[in-house]
Amino acid sequence: MEESKELQGFYKIFRAVIYISVLMEFFEYAIDPSPMGSIVCDLHSRIKQWMIYQDGNMAYSKIATFLLVCITCVGTRNKKHLEFDARKQVLYPLVSGVGFIVLSVWLFNTPMEMRVYMFSLNTLLYMAASVIGVVLVHIALDNISKFLKEGLLKDRFNFENESFEQCKDLQTNDYSVNIPMRYYYKGKFRKGWVNIVNPFRGTWVVGTPGSGKTFSIIEPFIRQHSEKGFAVVLYDYKFPTLATKLYYHYLKNKNAKDSKMPKGMKFNMINFVDVEYSRRVNPIQLKYINNLAAASETAETLLESLQKGKKEGGGGSDQFFQTSAVNFLAACIYFFCNWEKEPYDKDGNMLIAEKVQDKQTLRMIPTGRVFDKMGNEVEPAYWLGKYSDMPHILSFLNESYQTIFEVLETDNEVAPLLGPFQTALKNRAMEQLEGMIGTLRVYTSRLATKESYWIFHKDGDDFDLKVSDPKNPSYLLIANDPEMESIIGALNALILNRLVTRVNTGQGKNIPTSIIVDELPTLYFHKIHRLIGTARSNKVSVTLGFQELPQLEADYGKVGMQKIITTVGNVVSGSARSKETLEWLSSDIFGKVVQLKKGVTIDRDKTSINLNENMDSLVPASKISDMPTGWICGQTARDFVKTKTGRGGSMNIQESEEFKTSKFYCKTDFNMADIKKEEDGYVALPKFYTFKSRDERERILYKNFVQVGEDVKSMINTIQRYRVK
């Protein structure tokens, strides 16, 4: 604040009064007025009547001078010092000054015979100590005004402006996931909760390796959804890291007295590396693929999972060959689903189907009527083709083009899909045919392993992929292996695709399902955005974990990535590094808020303080990238809240529940003793198939592998025998 000339004048007057009071003290105590005439003596005697100048009251005089110094310094407006040192500039001078003042009183009362001119030595020393003491006290108190109390650089990283009130209350329901946390706000590290009250709107978790996203988010989803009676589908990229946790909670909640787990809940695993730990399942059957459209989607899933993100950016010819490959594979899938299909009851017992001969192909075609062994007409639980599974299809794809088309064209439903291929074959356009089918055969040949043939074989269909069926609920653990990621990922994608179509039905009658996929880019989740967007009514919670947006874009393509991140309602992030991820979180999730900024200007004559409000990032990108392990930030999806207003529609928008933020920036606060107790209770995973030795396992798998090829040869011979020439 700039001083006016009047204030400067008052300050000079007060400063002069200080030293006048010192001179008056010397006049009364140190000088003998008798040689100076009657006028001086009269003045001396009059002043002597003042209490502070009476004999023996020198201490009062010193106190009065000290008070004058204090009053004068209150109005001082010195130039501020950024590097203010209170000890050197205030404490040391003040203590020294008070010491000299006390010393001056002692010197005055200690007579010394030595004289200098008309004054005794002790009087001269008293006067010198008094002046030095007052000057030092004046300097010390004057320096206090040089202190800049505005706290420059006190909040160097802008923590105060970027901290905000977060949810302190636990909000729970039958489906919620609640994560205890602590957050900083207004000088306190407070306790709160991250309440994901609607997991059916989807959740994605992003963070660099080691940021704690699995421990902080994925594991609480497993723990709490298992406890609340969900059917859980879990993808374990590094088997058995998450598998042991899931199995622990399955056993814990199954055996609990107050368990919410549905009766009959089973635990299943799919593992293409250690087949002992795997159930067998057949996703290629009419139960899951009941029309040609479903076959086309299955084919598209398998092909895109093998290509993972390579579909985008191609021209018209690339799209033509891509579509041709999908149509060809779809024709093969649907053919095998229907070839010599037989009806079965719910217990897997074959029923008797009424059939008539097709005049064109001489094949026996079911009429639709089904009877049991007693001759009663019944409704079958499902139909199953004789070789309706993925191993037989993969083996069939290795046959010559001529043989493949001769077999497929015997099915009138798939024949229309074969037109372009047959034309190319008749015209000897082998390069075109290789472009349409050859790439598909190259990709799918990688899937033809002993393990995949064993697990996907139709004779080993151990469980139904509709894990949310109230009559037959189950947990499903889908395992992968980093060393065989692409191949196993494609096989797992096939299972997941058919599973999703089953659980995303039922008109809300299914039990709640939690699909948890950590390390999403290692698994191709076909049209996952569609599942997230439509699965709320069927109570399907989808949780996706990945490291960075560019990683997701590399495997799902830019369009696929955008579809995923824009349909998810709950967003959680650990530490991130990618520019795209940081900009998305800082700008689109957290946005900007009004912040109070303080500016201080110091020059020779004045110090100015400016306060202003402006919009700035609530959580800047640099703050997200610098988060330690265990810290998370993000935003949860909010459910409908009834609007409450006062008289005349008035509303305090700052206190209204409807306008409270669901954003969070916090440190997770788990009970580590409970987690340690949980980890100590982990048990070995179950083996579903037992082999006497590793060699026996290899013999059994190889025998099954060879048998599939023989089955395909037998099928081809049968069809060619009855084929109309």
Where are these regions (language model features)?
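Basic- and hydrophobic-enriched, low-structure N-terminal and domain-boundary segments
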Residues: 1-211, 215, 220, 228, ...
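P-loop NTPase motor domains
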Residues: 25, 35, 145-153, 194-540, ...
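Conserved ATP-driven motor cores of ASCE-family P-loop NTPases powering translocation/secretion/packaging/pilus
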Residues: 532-534, 538-541, 545-636
